[in-house]
Design a protein with these regions (language model features):
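Extracytoplasmic
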Residues: 45, 49, 85-91, 96-99, ...
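Acidic/histidine-enriched alpha-helical segments
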Residues: 141-147, 238-247, 302-304, 315-334, ...
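N-terminal type II signal-anchor transmembrane helix
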Residues: 1-101, 400
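Non-catalytic, structured segments within soluble enzyme domains
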Residues: 1-12, 17-19, 27, 137-141, ...
Length: 987
């Protein structure tokens, strides 16, 4: 007794110093566990990398638990951190109104308090595992050590070592078992040292509340019953705790077992059911010793052992003979996982899909791992509004509702087609330092998100990007020339093909008011022909383009008219001017088009090749940086307009060792609609084999920059190379790429090749501009067709561009997750919020204002005029609206030698409207039909415009100025923690 008193006093006194507190900001005074199944599942072992990852993604640690010096020293010695651990935790998510949208608790069935456990369950556990645990006669007892049991186990181990005993008895108490399966590596005891660590850790934990341990010992029993590992079930995963164990392995609910085994509740329940419940509880208590055996192959042995323990318990007077006999008469009936899977159903609503998917991506975890983290998070989504919009989009499949909304008519839908259209909607709100996503939903009920997860040809929405680039160039020219005198301007002589520079200089010469806004307005009033009669040399060949309406073909509209009415040819011609401007901004590039016999060209070309080659090599390096070989090739081929010749040239260059069979399989996969005979395949394989063409010729044939082709090949051979390695290795290739210009006899052939290469380089420049404004892909298709959508886009990325325009040219981070709270009420607690700061100016505010005005005209009298006057505030004040429409009819076409279309296979049809609603809200709405069925549809962007118009009554209450979409500012992602200290968990 004296020893127990001394032990209790000294350990409890020491344990009182092992504290932690929640402090502002980040701290280094914390030690996270490095192993242990419990710590791994809860995410505690991963917290260092998760916190670092989040800080790289614009999160900041606002509060973090800090260890006392004593606790820090204790854990540095390798002992497990003492605190009242959670037996149930999981992912909890709030929406922007602080309303719960997900509350996943694992395990799902457990006891909140010791008093809730039926005495029969406790006595069964203690009889099997730790009979003296709750002995009232020893108030100071250490639950970590059962000395008689420990001595017996030690003798057993000695006997086994001397080979005089076959099996050894275990000496673990429930307290040390909990330490083992929660915190030891792999949940196992690998050595005597590990056993000692478990015992010391359990002892300190037991005495942390004081020298008397009865309540701590009750907590041990409660924790064990709630958390004991019971193998992994098919289709479910890990099973922990008696409650989940009963349901998963036997299909029995914990509440029913409690009723059957509680003498105050079971008087009217059949004895046979009581016996079965007791048998199941006993079986799981026994099975925990070897769960993966007893719960699968060893079920007969488990039945036999359960019978034995039932008899022994009856002999000990713990159960009466009638209950014993009732239990012995039963057999364990395990769940048939094929016929009755133990599936955990998670609400599949779009709010949850979006948020869980975003969280998993943010943390680099699977959804299974994510749900089991000890984590609370908040999203910027408004779940109430999202549900209303989702319901609305689903109802559009009903012909009667679609008719009510006005979706039938020319360039819209017919009643029999309403169910085949998919709709996707995203709504953002402009905050002080972020673009907050309030709604992100569709009517597909699928995790895949059309807004973010797709590359779609969205047609005329690309005109917004082209017009943005154009106005940015005008602003650049204003900055360059706006302060020069008229005389100085008259001395300038830009190239005759650089029409944008020429216009800017002429404008500044003749206009007294040299401020930027009038110049931008004048630039929007420039006229471009809509004629379809011209053939354009672009993308390596001659192309013609058409307008949507034939009556536009004879027009000569201003750019703002062309945007308002979405006329194609003015934007194709504008893109040509932008390409030429880009070419002539580099003096080196311009010189290539000058005198073919200039003797300085060779020396210049060498310098040009080295300098320009490195510029483009770096761009391509960044394009492929961090990608695997397969991802690099996918990215490359996505940007290549596929023909048999181009693909053959690229494949034979990048994979020279490939067999004819591999080569044929590659072409047939990439060109499923093209019939390639064996003879044609052999011809291509031979003609473009290694050494048949130089690197520049290979690039010319494939219509790609030769250095991009070279870099792909180099990275295949040297995947660990740095950019410096690549630059050094490509010295000769950089000279070769540009040197071929002087080896062709005819200047026209030289100029033709030069124009192709310069166009590729110009589109690389343009891509940098687009990327700065949120363009989501690694490349643009180097063709004027990019002006009308051939490079693809994502609706969400276009919406971000609208946000930049609405925000006076300042790009803010797009936010869906704004608060994270890990490990609440534990020593590992950490709260993170979004890093607040200034946005990035990516556009002159004058350019943004000009674009807002242009987009407003699309609604006031253009392709989105259906919306005119439709959105009003609650007091009747009309909202200022603007946007851009676009329709994509995406096909795979086979073209004959004469240019005629031989076959046309529909891939999908899209219609998109990107918009702003008032000063703070913006977004995108897309109608989409995938696959060949899209050939039956003729809807245009009038469809999403009409759908948005029908949504007005739903959106109106959330668009009020200052209402923050009916969201509230959240201080935390979960309830405020209890006072920091030693006991800090829920249950």
């Amino acid at each position: 007794m004296r020893t127990s008193w001394l032990q209790a006093r000294e350990i409890s006194r020491y344990a009182q110093t092992l504290t932690y507190s929640l402090e502002p900001g980040a701290t280094q005074a914390v030690r996270y566990p490095s192993h242990g199944p419990f710590d791994q599942r809860m995410g505690y072992t991963r917290l260092p990398e998760l916190l670092a990852r989040l800080q790289q993604n614009r999160f900041v640690i606002e509060q973090q638990a800090q260890f006392s010096p004593a606790l820090l020293e204790y854990t540095q010695r390798g002992f497990f951190t003492p605190y009242q651990e959670k037996t149930q935790a999981g992912l909890f998510i709030n929406d922007c109104r602080a309303e719960s949208i997900h509350d996943y608790r694992y395990p799902q069935r457990h006891y909140e308090r010791f008093e809730q456990i039926p005495p029969l369950v406790v006595s069964a556990l203690l009889f099997i595992e730790n009979r003296e645990l709750l002995n009232n006669e020893q108030p100071l007892a250490n639950p970590a050590v059962d000395w008689p049991r420990f001595a017996k186990a030690a003798m057993s181990q000695l006997g086994r070592a001397l080979e005089i005993q076959d099996d050894s008895a275990g000496g673990s108490t429930l307290a040390t078992q909990i330490e083992k399966y929660r915190h030891s590596p792999g949940g196992l005891t690998h050595s005597a040292g590990e056993k000692l660590r478990q015992m010391i850790s359990a002892s300190v934990r037991a005495y942390q509340q004081g020298p008397e341990t009865l309540e701590a010992r009750k907590a041990v029993a409660l924790d064990y019953i709630n958390s004991v590992p019971l193998a992994a079930a098919p289709g479910h995963g890990e099973v922990h705790g008696l409650g989940d164990g009963l349901w998963i392995w036997f299909g029995t609910e914990l509440a029913r077992v409690n009723q059957l085994l509680d003498p105050t509740q079971n008087k009217d329940t059949p004895l046979a059911e009581q016996g079965q419940a007791l048998r199941q509880v006993m079986a799981l208590m026994i099975a925990q010793r070897r769960p993966s055996y007893y719960l699968f192959r060893g079920r007969d042995d488990l039945n036999t052992l359960t019978d034995s323990y039932l008899r022994i318990q009856a002999q000990a007077g713990l159960i009466n003979p009638a209950l014993r006999d009732a239990a012995l008469a039963q057999k364990l009936n395990f769940r048939n996982f094929r016929e009755d899977p133990a599936t955990v159903f998670i609400d599949n609503n779009k709010t949850l899909q979006v948020t869980r998917g975003r969280l998993a991506s943010l943390l680099g975890l699977s959804l299974y791992e994510l749900d089991r983290l000890d984590l609370s998070a908040s999203t910027t989504l408004n779940a109430e509004l999202q549900q209303k919009v989702s319901d609305y989009l689903h109802r559009l499949a009903d012909p009667e509702f679609a008719r009510e909304i006005g979706l039938f008519g020319e360039r819209l839908l017919s009643p029999e087609k309403t169910a085949d259209v998919r709709y996707s909607f995203t709504l953002f709100e402009r905050g002080a330092d972020s673009f907050d996503v309030r709604v992100q939903t569709d009517n597909t009920n699928q995790p895949f998100d059309i807004n973010e997860g797709s590359k779609l040809e969205l047609g005329s929405t690309a005109k917004l990007r082209v017009l943005t680039t154009y106005l940015e160039i005008i602003a650049e020219l204003h900055q360059r020339y706006g302060s020069k005198s008229v005389e100085s301007l008259r001395q300038l002589s830009p190239d005759r093909q650089d029409l944008l520079s020429r216009w800017a200089i002429d404008y500044l010469i003749r206009t007294p008011d040299r401020s930027l806004p009038p110049m931008l307005n004048a630039a929007l009033e420039r006229r471009y022909s809509a004629s379809t009669g011209e053939r354009f040399f672009t993308g390596g060949g001659m192309h013609t383009f058409g307008n949507f309406r034939r009556e536009d073909n004879g027009r000569n509209p201003t750019l703002i008219e062309a945007l308002r009415e979405s006329i194609n040819l003015p934007f194709v011609r504008l893109m040509r001017d932008i390409v030429r401007y880009s070419i002539y901004q580099s003096e080196n590039r311009a010189q290539l088009l000058e005198d073919d016999k200039d003797p300085r060209r060779q020396e210049y070309l060498s310098r040009f090749a080295d300098r320009e080659g490195q510029v483009f090599l770096l761009r391509f390096w960044r394009k492929y940086q961090g990608k695997t070989t397969e991802e690099r090739l996918d990215t490359f081929f996505d940007g290549l307009r596929p023909t048999a010749v181009r693909l053959a040239a690229v494949h034979r260059y990048l994979m020279p060792e490939a067999s004819p069979e591999e080569f044929a399989a590659f072409l047939q996969t990439r060109l499923p609609q093209e019939r390639l005979t064996e003879k044609r395949l052999d011809e291509l394989y031979t003609r473009y084999g290694p050494g048949a063409y130089s690197l520049p010729d290979q690039g010319y044939i494939a219509r790609v920059h030769p250095l991009e082709l070279w870099l792909l090949s180099y990275l295949q051979e040297s995947p660990e190379a740095t950019f410096a390695n690549a630059a050094e290795a490509s010295k000769d290739e950089r000279q070769e790429v540009y040197g071929w210009l002087f080896k062709t006899r005819h200047r026209s052939a030289r100029d033709s090749r030069l124009r192709i290469m310069l166009e590729v380089e110009a589109f690389s420049d343009i891509h940098l501009r687009w990327q700065r404004l949120g363009f989501p892909f690694d490349h643009l298709v180097p063709s004027l067709a990019t002006a009308i959508g051939s490079s693809g886009d994502k609706p969400a990325a276009l919406a971000e561009l609208i946000g930049i325009i609405l925000n006076d040219g300042v790009r803010l981070p797009t936010v869906r997750i704004d608060q994270l709270h890990f490990a609440a009420h534990t020593p590992y607690e950490a709260r993170l919020g979004r890093l607040h700061g200034q946005g990035q100016r990516v556009m002159d505010k004058e350019v943004a204002a000009a674009l807002r005005n242009a987009l407003s005209q699309v609604v006031d009298g253009g392709t989105a005029r259906r919306l005119q006057g439709s959105f009003r505030l609650e007091d009747g004040t009309p909202l200022v609206l603007g946007g851009k429409t676009g329709t994509g009819d995406n096909r795979i076409e086979t073209v004959g030698r004469g240019g005629q279309v031989l076959s046309s296979l529909a891939r999908n049809r899209t219609a998109t409207f990107v918009f702003f609603l008032g000063d703070n809200h913006f977004g995108t709405l897309t109608a989409y039909v995938p696959g060949r069925e899209s050939d039956k549809f003729r809807f245009t962007s009038a469809l999403p415009v009409q759908v948005l118009k029908g949504m007005e009554p739903i959106l109106r209450p959330y668009l009020q100025p200052g209402a923050r979409s009916q969201c509230q500012q959240q201080l935390a992602a979960s309830p405020e923690p209890k006072e920091a200290g030693m006991i800090k968990s829920e249950g």
